[in-house]
């Protein structure tokens, strides 16, 4: 099984996979819980998540904006939102003395953020961290501009949303820091990225966002696990994943951690380009750092992972 751009869906799929003993290759899921307290033996995740995003972007924000800042959060009301906000706020508080002055929580699918933005505008915050996902992220960012919150406050996207810059425009993404799984200009650095981006561009007529990279790599890694297992029997495939073989990806060498089935992989930091600096209509971001994954990760049992049985 595969699918999910919502971590709530990913967690539900984890439970279904374990119950039915069917392998689940996670789609997009940024919650700490997916390979934390809600991990299962039958689930594997390729992409980065709240804790690694926070530990990657945190030092960048402290260097760019300094210590002892006041921060506001916009948080979607489900597992992804709460865990990304928790990891980000805790890192910035512990390492930089940043203070969360307001955390505006909104339901999934909200279209009107006026109440949240009024509270944020009156909070005294200097930095706005928008954790909203998908269309919610687009609408809340656009409305933050309309309310004058942006550019009064620095905007940060602690967990980058595919197609966000395309939808809000370079005028809003300019200067914004974000952590991400992948950006297509990495084709200039990694051979596998170059192969994938060129093939994707030829077939679809535009450059891939990280959701496409995530899907491709997830199934390439599944195929590798099946090949080394010598068949499709799920317990054998799982044990093949758990061997921790070093694999090549679009961001360098990676491997799965056997204790929680989380891929140990770099996190990419990007910053939005000025419109005049863009070399094409999709050239929204500059890759500023590629940060090794292992030092960003919590200990395997820190978030309560207990994988369960093979059969």
Where are these regions (language model features)?
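Sec-exported extracytoplasmic/periplasmic mature domains
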Residues: 14-22, 62-67, 89-97, 118-125, ...
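Structural motif
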Residues: 53-57, 105-120
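Catalytic-loop motifs flanking and including active-site residues across diverse enzymes
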Residues: 53, 57, 84, 136, ...
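Extracellular/periplasmic periplasmic-binding protein-like sensory domains
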Residues: 40, 141-216, 227-233, 237-238, ...
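Solvent-exposed, acidic/polar segments of extracytosolic/periplasmic ligand-binding ectodomains
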Residues: 174, 243-311
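Hydrophobic alpha-helical
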Residues: 7-18, 112, 118, 125-147, ...
């Amino acid at each position: 099984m595969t699918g999910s751009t919502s971590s709530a869906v990913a967690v539900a799929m984890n439970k279904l996979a374990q119950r039915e003993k069917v392998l689940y290759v996670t789609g997009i899921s940024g919650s700490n819980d997916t390979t934390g307290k809600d991990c299962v033996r039958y689930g594997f995740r390729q992409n980065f998540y709240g804790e690694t995003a926070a530990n990657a972007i945190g030092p960048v924000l402290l260097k760019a904006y300094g210590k002892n800042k006041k921060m506001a959060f916009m948080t979607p009301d489900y597992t992804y939102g709460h865990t990304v906000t928790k990891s980000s706020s805790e890192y910035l508080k512990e390492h930089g003395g940043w203070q969360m002055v307001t955390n505006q929580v909104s339901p999934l699918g909200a279209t009107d953020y006026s109440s949240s933005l009024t509270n944020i505008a009156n909070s005294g915050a200097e930095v706005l961290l928008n954790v909203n996902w998908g269309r919610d992220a687009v609408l809340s960012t656009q409305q933050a501009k309309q309310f004058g919150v942006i550019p009064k406050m620095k905007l940060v996207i602690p967990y980058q949303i595919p197609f966000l810059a395309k939808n809000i425009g370079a005028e809003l993404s300019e200067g914004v820091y974000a952590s991400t799984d992948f950006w297509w200009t990495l084709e200039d650095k990694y051979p596998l990225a170059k192969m994938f981006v060129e093939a994707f561009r030829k077939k679809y007529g535009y450059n891939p966002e990280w959701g496409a990279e995530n899907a491709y790599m997830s199934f390439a890694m599944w195929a590798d696990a099946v090949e080394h297992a010598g068949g499709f029997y799920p317990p054998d495939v799982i044990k093949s994943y758990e061997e921790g073989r070093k694999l090549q990806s679009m961001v360098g060498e990676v491997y799965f951690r056997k204790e929680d089935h989380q891929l140990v992989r770099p996190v990419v930091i990007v910053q939005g380009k000025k419109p005049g600096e863009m070399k094409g209509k999709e050239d929204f971001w500059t890759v500023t750092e590629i940060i090794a994954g292992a030092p960003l990760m919590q200990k395997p049992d820190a978030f309560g992972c207990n994988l369960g049985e093979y059969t």
